Amino acid sequence: MEKIEMLEGILNSYPYPIVFVDNDYIIRYMNRNAEYHYYEERGYKDLIGKSLFECHNNEQSIEKIKMAWEGMKKNGKEVFITLTSRNQRVYMQGVRDYKGNWIGFIERFELNLQK
């Protein structure tokens, strides 16, 4: 099995959406659950290669995402973004290449189990 196929399988086994966005806010990867969430549930089409701000397109969201990304680059910590109407927490986590350079971030969802 190729490393890429293995990583794709790992990411697709995660039960919630995962989206990778590069330093220029371009969507580069979506796992199966992210594709379902954005394409089937929210009605977007062909987001790979497009700006993250095509689906997060209000000023408040844009500013929150940009501030979170700048904060992550400074302190390296994951950032809580919001709690969805489906009781899922959304986080952003910075991603570095093997040399330690920032290459973007992932947006990931998880079920909010706190009461």
What name fits each language-model region?
Residues 29, 33, 37-115:
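Sensory/regulatory domains in signal-transduction proteins
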Residues 1-30:
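Sensory modules in modular signal-transduction proteins
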